[in-house]
A protein has these predicted regions:
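Preference for protein termini
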Residues: 1-501
């Protein structure tokens, strides 16, 4: 009994000690990695000094109380995502770390210009390959790479959407290297997701740190995104009515991103529909309502190409609408993103984006790509096979971090299996060196610790462009991990664009 009492007393003292501890930036150590908050032990980078000082003023117990408040807010607000598994679909509460990421506004302004430049060039490229194909004739990009892409849609040949824009919504994944410079890791053009979580992260952060939003920082707002998205969609409406009928087409409640579909429809004031809610008559799309059929002008579709129209693509699809593709071809309805836009989502095509920017815009890329190796090229493929244990290998058309190999963390068996896959289908693989991703602090159980992050800003394009101030910061919650995807254990943070001063 005495021993148990003594143990309990020691545990109580330890808990009280941890609870009253404060963040000690002198002992915070990101090792060889570039940390975005702390430049050297005890010293915060200029834009983050206010945040670092504020966190230092709180005890660890007070920080944990704020974390509990954030968790409760997420639960109350119903912010969730779905994970698919063999055991069934599991709804999970959104993983959120309360310590925000800080980016200086001058740095972000340059990054924003780079993202707009990139999407302009990508849209020129998509419009060209489905029409004149000048880039093939000028031998800038090999035609066989495009025509062999799993996302190339021959059915889209000869089509020219309004403004020549195919990808109206893009989510590009950015990383910072060991020098703190942004690089584009990949472009998501098919059905980019995550923007609702960016918006909800901000709502939660305001609840947790209201005093920082009121006094300390001039943080750029992000709340205008739904309005900007609606304006982008309205701009591509075939009919010039003052209030175009915009709908969000969802696969349904069992889709992993259904929360986002519902969220965006509600915030835009648009109808959330499934394929069964729509019908095509005389090459026009109508929505079924209690008052009869209502013509639809714009469909923000959150369904992959192959499922949007069973009469053209996957004949077994029950998610889309028969006749929808032809209605789009005839110009009677706009689709965002347009069918076929995903051809530029191909990770093999990604390697050509710098050349694509130079070709169509006659500009040097503002944002660089990560060095990449194409397995379809024999010489580069040999390099990849000889250095598999040092590289990250990605399949051309997977997303969410699935199907990839992180060489330095792979077993001998995994390396051998990937070598076999690459040799069997070299067109389907590309490789990149393992970048020393930057770190930011997260709130651990006992101390503040560094973790790796990436960033997904969202870019809109129609008659004009828009970039979210910041984006969805994804963080690897496990020490040493590079996996930031929420479906694989990653978390998220609010992203603050703040003054450099």
């Amino acid at each position: 009994v005495l021993r148990a009492a003594a143990l309990f007393a020691k545990l109580t003292i330890l808990i009280l000690k941890v609870a009253t501890m404060r963040v000690n930036w002198k002992t915070y150590n990101s090792g060889k990695f570039y940390d975005e908050i702390i430049s050297s032990p005890g010293y915060a980078r200029k834009p983050a000094r206010g945040l670092a000082s504020y966190l230092r003023s709180l005890t660890h117990g007070e920080l944990l109380e704020k974390k509990t408040a954030a968790d409760l807010a997420i639960k109350t607000m119903g912010i969730s995502f779905t994970v698919y598994s063999d055991a069934g679909n599991i709804d999970r509460e959104w993983p959120f770390d309360i310590i925000p990421r800080i980016i200086a506004e001058k740095e972000w302004d340059k990054t924003s210009l780079g993202l707009q430049q990139r999407l302009r060039a990508i849209n020129c490229f998509i419009n060209d390959i489905y029409n004149e194909q000048k880039i093939f004739k000028d031998k800038v990009v090999p035609s066989e790479l495009i025509l062999d892409s799993g996302n190339f849609r021959k059915e889209c040949m000869g089509i020219k959407p309004r403004f020549g824009v195919w990808a109206h919504i893009c989510g590009s994944d950015l990383i910072k290297d060991g020098n703190g410079d942004f690089f584009v890791l990949e472009d998501n053009l098919r059905v980019p997701s995550g923007v609702s979580y960016m918006l909800e992260n901000r709502r939660v952060a305001k609840r947790v740190f209201p005093e920082l939003f009121e006094d300390a920082y001039n943080i750029r707002p992000i709340t205008e995104y739904p309005a900007q998205l609606f304006d982008t969609l309205a701009a591509i409406s075939p009919r010039k009515n003052k209030y175009p009928e915009v709908v969000v087409l969802t696969p349904g409640i069992y889709n992993s991103a259904y929360f986002e579909h519902s969220f965006l429809a509600q915030r835009m004031g648009a109808e959330l529909v499934e394929g069964s809610d729509l019908v095509v008559e005389n090459d026009k799309v109508y929505m079924k309502t209690i008052d009869g059929l209502s013509q639809v002008d714009v469909i923000y579709r959150r369904i992959d190409d192959e499922f949007i129209d069973p009469s053209v693509f996957n004949k077994d699809s029950v998610l889309g609408v028969s006749g929808l593709f032809n209605a789009w071809v005839k110009g009677n309805v706009a689709l965002a993103n347009a069918p076929g836009a995903g051809v530029a989502d191909d990770k093999v095509i990604y390697t050509y984006i710098p050349k694509i920017i130079k070709y169509y815009l006659d500009e040097d890329p503002i944002l660089p790509n990560v060095e990449s190796f194409l397995c379809v090229d024999k010489k580069q493929c040999q390099h990849v096979l000889e250095n598999l244990n040092k590289l990250v290998v990605k399949p051309a058309n997977e997303s969410g971090g699935y199907g990839m190999l992180i060489g330095p963390q792979a077993s001998k068996k995994e390396l051998e299996e990937f070598a076999r896959r690459i040799k069997a289908d070299p067109r389907n693989y590309m490789a990149q060196p393992l970048i020393s991703l930057s770190t930011v602090p997260i709130l651990g159980d006992r101390v503040v610790e560094p973790r790796h992050v990436d960033l997904r800003p969202f870019v809109l394009q129609a008659d004009k462009s828009y970039v979210t101030p910041g984006g969805l910061t994804r963080v690897a919650m496990v020490k040493g991990s590079y996996i930031v995807n929420s479906s694989q254990g990653g978390g998220s943070k609010d992203t603050w664009i703040v003054s450099d001063d």
